[in-house]
Amino acid sequence: MTMARNWRDIRADAVAQGRVDLQRAAVAREEMRDAVLAHRLAEIRKALGHARQADVAALMGVSQARVSKLESGDLSHTELGTLQAYVAALGGHLRIVAEFGENTVELTA
């Protein structure tokens, strides 16, 4: 009779055998997170009545392609000023929170 194995053991075996690359998995998780966040930004843009990326781009002073890139998940490579301009164009305010253990500092942009 085969005993059920827990996920931790299966994962450890896969890593040891080279079937799973933890670094690639971490990068994939970050890319997925960025894509989900970017999609949420696009949904908010549309919900606020800005149907076209070109309209937001004009408010920001950038190209429509730049807004498209931002909304396609390129958040980790987006400059803070660009993200701030995007949020401001939608009528929002960007907040950044730095955490150091139990200490936090809120930075406003």
Swiss-Prot record:
InterPro entries: Cro/C1-type_HTH, Lambda_DNA-bd_dom_sf. Keywords: DNA-binding, Toxin-antitoxin system, Transcription, Transcription regulation. Residues 53-72 bind DNA. Coiled coil: none annotated. The keyword Transcription regulation applies. Putative antitoxin component of a type II toxin-antitoxin (TA) system. Its cognate toxin would be HigB3. This is Putative antitoxin HigA3. The lineage of its organism: Bacteria, Bacillati, Actinomycetota, Actinomycetes, Mycobacteriales.
